Design a protein with these regions (language model features):
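Short, electropositive alpha-helical surface patch
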Residues: 189-207
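Nucleotide and nucleotide-moiety/phosphate-recognizing core
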Residues: 2-154, 164-179, 186-191, 209-213, ...
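Conserved TIR/SEFIR loop-to-helix hotspot centered on a Trp-containing motif
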Residues: 157
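Hydrophobic secondary-structure segments that place a key small or acidic residue at a functional site
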Residues: 160
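Acidic, Ser/Thr-rich low-complexity intrinsically disordered segments
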Residues: 241-245
Length: 245
């Protein structure tokens, strides 16, 4: 579906949510109001632009899975499950337009490196008039064990340069949800860049796949129901997983 067709089909929709995926890059999701504005509980002026999921992907990355790609893989899983094709460039990002359930979304992956990923996020959020609290950032987290998820309604940058860039281009604000996927910490004195770009073991790959499968369901829940208490069900039975409010 082209952007123009999506805008025509959903011209009465108004953007209210934004989901971004940031590993060493950032991916982004935009979600409009539901037919019944009360279901979203947010004030938003009707806007002629259409909102979909947006996914950005850096073409310089290898096809092999490496820790720093886990955020992009999360968005790729969403695009595969929801049948959203990424075929348009906007604001230095590769975007795909479709829907999750009955909610039109834009999946996005910035084409720039991590330190500059906010250059895509800021303009997209402004263009689609997305409230800050409806921006969902998905990214890798070294402070969490491999394959462990963490969901928060807001937070700081945690020394993550991709998140820093995003906050910079959102006027320094931090009140947007985060969806972190653990990639484990540095073993010993290993160089960080080497660690982030190394191929992972089969065991670690299985852990990540399980997290991605669970993450797709979590994102779908957030898009359709909001970032509420039901998200905690994705954290059951795992010591390091938690829904922090």
């Amino acid at each position: 579906m082209t952007l123009s067709k999506a805008l025509e089909k959903h011209k009465w929709w108004c953007p209210t949510s934004l989901l971004l995926s940031s590993n060493h890059f950032v991916a982004l999701v935009l979600v409009p109001l539901l037919q019944n504005p009360l279901e979203v509980n947010v004030a938003c002026n009707i806007c002629p632009k259409k909102l979909q999921y947006i996914i950005f992907k850096n073409p310089l990355l290898s096809k092999a899975f490496i820790p720093s790609k886990v955020g992009f893989e999360m968005i790729d899983r969403v695009s595969q499950e929801e049948g959203i094709v990424l075929n348009t460039i906007q604001s230095k990002a590769l975007i795909g337009i479709g829907s999750i359930g009955e909610v039109p979304v834009v999946l996005a992956k910035p084409q720039s490196y991590m330190n500059f990923s906010g250059e895509s996020v800021g303009p997209l959020a402004a263009y689609y008039q997305v409230p800050l609290r409806h921006i969902i950032l998905v990214y890798d987290e070294m402070s969490l064990p491999n394959g462990i998820l963490r969901l928060q309604p807001k937070g700081g940058h945690g020394h993550h340069n991709g998140v820093k860039s995003m906050m910079k281009h959102l006027d320094g604000r931090r009140e947007f949800p985060r969806f972190c996927i653990g990639i484990g910490n540095l073993p010993g004195t290993m160089d960080m860049k080497a660690y982030l770009l190394q191929k992972i073991s089969d065991t670690e790959r299985k852990q990540v796949d399980a997290a991605l499968d669970q993450g797709v369901e979590a994102i779908r829940t957030v898009v359709l129901e909001g970032f509420g208490s039901r998200i905690s069900r994705f954290n059951i039975g795992q010591k390091y997983k938690y829904h922090k409010v």
